[in-house]
Amino acid sequence: MTDIYFPPRELEVMSILWRLGSATVADVREALDQPLAYTSVLSALQTLEEKGFVRHEPHGRAYKYFAVVGAERAGGSALARIKDAIFHGSAERMFAQLVSDKKLSREELERMRGLLAERIKEEP
């Protein structure tokens, strides 16, 4: 898998595009947690487009921006970096940290158990 890395501002913009499906610069500005100038948002979108993560299409007098790379692919790349940097390459240690989170509901834990059971069935 090609490593995908987003600096914080670009990650926030990508998160908005993943959530909304598509957005104009104004839509992204409105969805941001912190107010940002129109030109700053436009610059972030243009940078993401140059990197091949976003594309745009005309939409009236504006442009609609779309994520080209999916959240799952970007998330997999980010998790691989976290696993290597923080958990010394151990998926088991990373998983143990995740399931020790007391904020996980019983339903979430049950779904995780089901995912593990399916994955175990796939192994020869």
Language-model segments: which ranges?
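Short alpha-helical segments that sit at the start of domains
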Residues: 1-14, 122
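Short helix-to-turn junction characteristic of helix-turn-helix DNA-binding domains
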Residues: 17-21, 98
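Short, hydrophobic-biased segments on the C-terminal half of alpha helices
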Residues: 42-46
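Short, cationic-aromatic polyanion-contact patches
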Residues: 3-9, 59-78
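Short beta-strand "wing" residues that participate in macromolecule-binding interfaces
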Residues: 55-56
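Amphipathic alpha-helical dimerization/coiled-coil segments
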Residues: 76-121
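Short acidic, hydrophobic short linear motifs in intrinsically disordered regions
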Residues: 22-32
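Glycine-centered, phosphate/nucleic-acid-interacting loop/turn motifs that mediate DNA/RNA or nucleotide
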Residues: 52
